[in-house]
């Protein structure tokens, strides 16, 4: 028996349009197991959540430590945790040399970049010069790009140290990181569970403190769902906010490079470093890039209702029967805390919500069938020896691509074929327009929208690997945001039962186009409601420095 959220009739049914509903959100305390210091609380901490980036910078400038010492500490933590997590496909060999260069700058009293000495993980579908960039696929196993992606170049220009390339589902096609051709990444909160996907390696690396921040990509939720599963902050920017140059194309009208951090401040600092117009990407926007963290303040220094007047819409369809009840309780609790901060929280309906998931998979698969045609063993990709050209193409792709990639290429080719284009691809584009209109209407009445980031907490490795429908259904909370091209921030809001210390739940905040600044400001205030705000996984409880 399929659960409601797995049932195709649930995914395809037309949602009724509900009028806005205003009610008080009383938290029915979810199962916040162990580590009570992480519970959402009405008693704010005395200081805001610590920014690791700002702490590193302050320690370097005031010479309390050196970049080399920090690098050695981080590499040691990575060596201790990596055998259990498998976050990285490859680790840079130049880390210590880059750290030495930062120390030399300090010795010469030169100005440091905003990311100086900060360890940054990079998802392995984002190109890095002179480092492997595999896309998680055998067909690119030996590929070393001659250039950096624009986002990577900007990280390096700001002094960031790329520690390595993180694991992912092949070409970003998956929700568990089990689809990698090289290894399966585990969730630091429970190593028997998935970290989410497709940016599972990037999320797990930040959660396990193997790096300070990381870059991922988000086509249908690949930053936000892993952030929820791993208890970290994840940001999907507006489409066009961050250059896609150097990102391996999956679905070009949906792909976005996003950010992970252990705090909203670190995530905002990373976004500021990589955002902005790039002439190498024709979809890049010329919208001004604000200083996302310049207005961040401790909640103790603000008025008692720091978010007074903010209109928040809780998306009703995201609390449906197919969503884990403990997850719903956590989100309702988060809505209650937003009200305590001064927000007006109202239930809103997105009439086209349930149509987004099937439309997304038609559009994404169609675009991938075109984008991945370049990997033929001649222009790109590993080549398999063959006597005839057609055999070379076929054998190279058959042996180079994994099963999920093949399935999506076939699905996309079918949807674009003569006789089926109007029935599938064209209708999916029409649904996309409906989704965009639904969000526009909702955001005309609300400043931000909120929902769960995923319908469940992290599940066991292998649990859904052979059930594509169930795995696809897990994206229902996130794909609509990509169809609309809007920004969304995910941050931890509590725990539910599972694993040795509970499993994190993520709250998704959705904003208007290019309004990342508002999302980050609200997120920064909200996270200070979490006592001590240290979502430290059990993996790090055994004496490994955090």
Swiss-Prot record:
The active site is at 123 (charge relay system), 198 (charge relay system), 222 (acyl-ester intermediate). Residues 21-52 are annotated as: Disordered. Its EC number is 6.3.5.7. It is found in: Mitochondrion; Plastid, Chloroplast stroma. GO terms for biological process: glutaminyl-tRNAGln biosynthesis via transamidation; mitochondrial translation. Keywords: ATP-binding, Chloroplast, Ligase, Mitochondrion, Nucleotide-binding, Plastid, Protein biosynthesis. One of its GO terms (molecular function) is glutaminyl-tRNA synthase (glutamine-hydrolyzing) activity. Residues 27-43 have a biased composition (Polar residues). Pfam families: Amidase (PF01425). Its main location: mitochondrion. Belongs to the amidase family. GatA subfamily. NCBIfam families: gatA. This protein may be expected to contain an N-terminal transit peptide but none has been predicted. Allows the formation of correctly charged Gln-tRNA(Gln) through the transamidation of misacylated Glu-tRNA(Gln) in chloroplasts and mitochondria. The reaction takes place in the presence of glutamine and ATP through an activated gamma-phospho-Glu-tRNA(Gln). This is Glutamyl-tRNA(Gln) amidotransferase subunit A, chloroplastic/mitochondrial. The lineage of its organism: Eukaryota, Viridiplantae, Streptophyta, Embryophyta, Tracheophyta.
């Amino acid at each position: 028996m399929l659960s409601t959220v797995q049932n195709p009739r649930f995914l395809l049914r037309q949602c009724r349009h509900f009028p806005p509903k205003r009610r008080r959100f009383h938290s029915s305390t979810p199962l916040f197991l162990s580590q009570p210091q992480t519970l959402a609380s009405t008693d704010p901490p005395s200081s805001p959540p610590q920014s690791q980036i700002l702490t590193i910078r302050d320690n370097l400038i005031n010479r309390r430590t050196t970049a080399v010492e920090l690098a050695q500490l981080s590499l040691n933590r990575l060596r201790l945790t990596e055998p259990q997590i498998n976050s990285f496909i490859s680790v840079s060999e130049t880390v210590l040399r880059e750290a030495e260069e930062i120390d030399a700058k300090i010795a010469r009293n030169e100005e440091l970049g905003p990311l100086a000495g900060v360890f940054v993980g990079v998802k392995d579908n984002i190109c890095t010069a002179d480092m492997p960039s595999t896309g998680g696929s055998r067909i690119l196993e030996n590929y070393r790009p001659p250039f950096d992606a624009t986002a990577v170049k900007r990280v390096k220009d700001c002094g960031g140290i790329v520690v390595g390339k993180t694991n992912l589902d092949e070409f970003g096609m998956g929700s568990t990181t089990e689809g990698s051709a090289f290894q399966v990444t585990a969730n630091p909160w429970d190593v028997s569970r998935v970290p989410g996907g497709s940016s599972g390696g990037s999320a797990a690396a930040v959660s396990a403190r193997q790096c300070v921040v990381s870059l991922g990509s988000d086509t249908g939720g690949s930053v936000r769902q892993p952030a929820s599963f791993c208890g970290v902050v994840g940001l999907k920017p507006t489409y066009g906010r961050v250059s896609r140059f150097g990102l391996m194309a999956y679905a070009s009208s949906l792909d976005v490079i996003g950010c992970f951090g252990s705090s909203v401040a670190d995530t905002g600092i990373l976004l500021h470093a990589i955002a902005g117009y790039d002439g190498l990407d024709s979809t890049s926007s010329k919208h001004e890039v604000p200083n996302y963290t310049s207005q961040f303040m401790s909640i103790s220094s603000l008025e008692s209702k720091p978010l007074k007047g903010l209109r928040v819409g809780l998306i009703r369809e995201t609390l449906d029967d197919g969503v884990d009840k403990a997850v719903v309780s956590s989100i309702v609790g988060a809505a209650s805390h937003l009200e305590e901060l001064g927000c007006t929280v109202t239930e809103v309906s997105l009439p086209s919500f349930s149509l987004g998931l099937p439309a997304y998979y038609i559009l994404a698969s169609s675009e991938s069938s075109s984008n991945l045609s370049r990997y033929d063993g001649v222009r790109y990709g590993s080549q398999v020896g063959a006597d005839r050209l057609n055999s070379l193409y076929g054998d190279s792709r058959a042996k180079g691509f994994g099963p999920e990639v093949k399935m999506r290429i076939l699905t996309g080719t079918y949807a674009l074929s003569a006789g089926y284009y109007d029935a599938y691809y064209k209708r999916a584009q029409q649904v996309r327009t409906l989704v965009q209109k639904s969000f526009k209407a909702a955001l005309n009445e609300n400043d931000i929208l909120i929902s769960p980031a995923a319908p469940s907490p992290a599940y066991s490795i292998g649990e859904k690997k052979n059930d594509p429908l169930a795995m696809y259904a897990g994206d229902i909370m996130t794909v609509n945001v990509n169809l609309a091209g809007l920004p969304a921030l995910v941050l931890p809001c509590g725990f539910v039962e599972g694993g040795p210390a509970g499993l994190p739940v993520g709250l998704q905040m959705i904003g208007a186009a290019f309004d990342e600044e508002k999302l980050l400001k609200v997120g920064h205030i909200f996270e200070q409601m979490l006592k001590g705000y240290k979502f430290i996984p059990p993996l790090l409880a055994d004496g490994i420095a955090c």
